[in-house]
Amino acid sequence: MADAFVGTWKLVDSKNFDDYMKSLGVGFATRQVASMTKPTTIIEKNGDTITIKTHSTFKNTEISFQLGVEFDEVTADDRKVKSVVTLDGGKLVHVQKWDGQETTLTRELSDGKLILTLTHGNVVSTRTYEKEA
C-alpha cells in the first residue's frame, strides 16, 4: 500500500500552517518564510525502505525509514526528534516525539491528491499536494 504514495508531490493548498508552526515554537521570521514556501515532496520506496525528501527554497530535508522502526530525525525547524512511521488503514502515520511533546503527520491519498494533516496538541494544519506528471 505504501507504493501508492511513491511519486513527486507539489504543495497546492495549505490551511492553518502558521498556527501549527507557532504551536511548535517556531519563530516569527522562520514562520513567515516557511508559510510562503511551496515545497515539493518526493516519496521513494526501495525494498522495505521508504525515503521522503522535501525540497523548497526554505530548506531541504530527507528521511529514510522502515515502517514501524523508530529513527532519529532532525526536522526542518531543527528539532531533534524520535520518529516512527506506520501504515494505518491506508494512511502513512508519522509520529515525532521530543522533550515530552508529540506531533503527528498523517499522509493519505484522496481523489488523486496527497493530504498531509499535521497535529500538535489541539492545533491541526492541512496541506494538500498534487502529483506531478
Swiss-Prot record:
GO molecular function: cytoskeletal protein binding; fatty acid binding; icosatetraenoic acid binding; long-chain fatty acid binding; long-chain fatty acid transmembrane transporter activity; oleic acid binding
Residues the entry annotates as binding hexadecanoate: 127-129
Entry's localization field: Cytoplasm
Gene3D superfamilies xrefs: 2.40.128.20
Keywords: Acetylation, Cytoplasm, Lipid-binding, Phosphoprotein, Transport
Predominant location: cytoplasm
Modified residues (N-acetylalanine): 2
UniProt-annotated binding residues for (9Z)-octadecenoate: 127-129
Family annotation (InterPro entries): Calycin, Fatty_acid-bd, ILBP, Lipocln_cytosolic_FA-bd_dom
Single GO cellular component term: cytosol
Amino acids binding octadecanoate: 127-129
Protein family (similarity comment): Belongs to the calycin superfamily. Fatty-acid binding protein (FABP) family.
Protein name: Fatty acid-binding protein, heart
Source organism: Rattus norvegicus (Rat)
Gene it is expressed from: Fabp3
